[in-house]
Amino acid sequence: MTDASNIARLELNASHYENRREPFTFTHPQFTALWENRLSDENYRTVLACGAKNLYGFLTFKNEIESGKILALYIDPLYMRLGIGKLLLQTAEQMVRIKGGSSIEVDVEVLNKRAISFYTSLQFAKVSVKLDHLIVMRKEFYNA
């Protein structure tokens, strides 16, 4: 299996925990094609959390890393609540800081209470709602 196929499988499996208003309609081959395009496109950056045989999670953002806009953060359901999401976010935060960014932002499904709680526990705050179903959450960086 390719990275794109593994990412597609993980996102499809984990998406059931998002409480989406509209479920994904993509098939695994369609998602794999989408991820093949993203992984080869210089406009996206993806950080993988993986072991010798498993992909545990991933985080993707636009190439303008300093903007801090996370497009996707998914953890394999078998490995949720083990700190992998927090580690991926800490890595992304460091990448944004290195590039001179001052915040990190993510859109969360309004019904995804687990994710809202997760981001809130990491000092993200709700800043707006868009498209009736996404909460924009942001964490501002403050220099000590």
Protein language model features and the residues they cover:
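Conserved beta-strand in the GNAT
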Residues: L48, N54-K62, K69, Y74
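Conserved GNAT-fold acetyl-CoA-binding loop/helix
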Residues: L12-L34
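Conserved acetyl-CoA-binding loop-helix of GNAT-fold acetyltransferases
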Residues: I75, R81-Q94, S117-S121
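A conserved beta-turn-beta hairpin within the catalytic core of GNAT-like acetyltransferases
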Residues: K62-L71, M80, K130-H133
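Conserved GNAT acetyl-CoA-binding A-motif
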Residues: L89, V96-D107
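A short beta-loop-alpha structural element at the N-terminal edge
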Residues: M1-R9, S128
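C-terminal "cap" of GNAT-fold acetyltransferases
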Residues: S102-A144
